[in-house]
Amino acid sequence: MSTAATVAGAAAMAPLLSACGGGSSKKAAANTKEGLKAALPAYVPNTNAVKPDIAPVQGGSDAATDAGYLSYPASPPASVSGVPGKGGSYTAVTPLWGTAPPVGNSFYQAMNKALGVELTMKPADGINYSTIIPTMTAAQKLPDWINLPSWLNANFNTGGLVGTQLADLTPYLSGDNVKKYPNLASLPTGAWQTGVWGDKLYGIPCFSTSFGIPGATFYRRDVLEARGITADQVKSADDLMNIGKELTDAKRGVWAFDDVWTYLQTAWNVPMNWRIDNGKLVHPFETQEFLEALDWHYRLATSGYMHPEALAGDVANGATRFYSGKSLIGGGGLGAWNLGDHQSGVAADPNYRRGAFNAITADGKGTPVIYMGAAASMISYLNANLKPAQIEELIAVANYLAAPYGTAEYTLVNYGVEGVHHTRVNGVPTFTDEGKKDVQATTFPFLAAPGSVISNPGGEQVTKDYTSWSAANVKYLTKPPFWGMNFTMPQALATAAAAPSVNDTLKDCYHGKKKVSDVQDAIASWRSGPGERLKQWMTDNVLDKYGAGQ
């Protein structure tokens, strides 16, 4: 499996904003440059980590690819000595998309024994998490430990919770203080930044990465290569359009494209959220690049090269179309590139192989740009009512949960007890029936987790393909304005930032139902009201006070 976060891929494309209503509750401001530096934990590489088969490749802007592993360690080494807990009793809430494990199951019991605490896991429905948590915060009844996904900061008003209902971890983890916890100290600095509000550290990152790319334009590598088409032949938008013509055969029910707008627009250098020109904020909707990208996608939608179901807005069956070869090119989050995808694809077509095009520029000239998304989007927090000794106990537990890939602790957290929850099949930890029922990736790892790695035991080619593509593209990563910055925005402006009326028209345009001029009209209406207010607020409250975070 890939331990890169497979949830919230699109969330990586947004600033880590929180929203507040019109009340007078305390709200955390953004971070100052000096305050952020003081709050962040020191970074110390983990000497207990298992050596990867494919080493990370460094890029610019603090970017680096995730390490790759082609097999699971036969004898997982320990990264923690002794038992971290001291017998405390706590509750924890994490979002769960799926069936909740039985209460008090054997995996929970094994974890509590290893952790030295009585940690009662209370996974909550992930689909309704955005409404479940505000009910808790309104009653001021948060659990001792909770996961608050950053893409829901606006729903939760996280900026209003830090320091009031959520504990300040700065005294325990900032600077060299984190060195007491080697597994936590090895997490990327950018990931810790997602949990800093108002120059204080509150959050513990899960599934962190220095390769925070929201997604890519994927293609059926097996099909295209059989037609003599390789990824390095695609250097411009025209190249893609020409391939679309070559691959589409409507009579056989094959179309070249599914939806590609979300992750392809950067080929025109459309900004992620904002651009700064001569000290002034410019929204993507205001740029010529946005209109040029949209024009190309409108022409694609009306070319006959896009699958009719995609044009009709059918997202749910996109993977099925891709696996069956009915559509051959489509955008998606990087979490799709994993062993499960390979297994589903091979079940539909034994020759199935996923590939991704390298970053391109629309005109085939110059250097491509890939805007970095957040280094972590799953963040956990501790309750402000906890005593210092309790906070220290749970941080020690978090250090255990953050044990690197392939260690003894990682194996227990992710696979349970060998012989009970998993057995080794060809060297790969494989769940038993009890393990399938009890061990959930969205429970303990949503409280703390190691940095992401790429590993697909039994699907080594997937790991090789993914890491090869990552290595070829990491040099294009760059941080957009306000990268990793947390700030509290009025609810009305958070809605303005989402621009639902524009995005509805935009979607109709890249599906060929409305013209570019219709989108321009929607943008003009948005700019004249909420758009201008949003820009002014961002200028006055973030850019002028704290800079762009770069």
What are these regions (language model features)?
Residues 262-272, 298-301, 305-441:
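Extracytoplasmic/periplasmic substrate-binding proteins
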Residues 113-190, 196, 222-228, 232, ...:
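Extracytoplasmic "Venus flytrap"/periplasmic binding protein-like
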Residues 60, 66, 71-78, 396-508, ...:
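Conserved small-residue motifs centered on glycine
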Residues 85-98, 117-122, 145, 202, ...:
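Short, well-ordered beta-strand elements
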Residues 1-20, 329:
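N-terminal export signals
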Residues 20-29:
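Bacterial lipoprotein signal-peptidase II cleavage site
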Residues 45-47, 51-73, 155-214, 264-266, ...:
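Hinge/lid segment of periplasmic solute-binding proteins
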Residues 196-263, 276-317, 321, 382-392, ...:
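Helix-loop-helix "hinge/cap" segment bordering the ligand-binding cleft or interdomain interface
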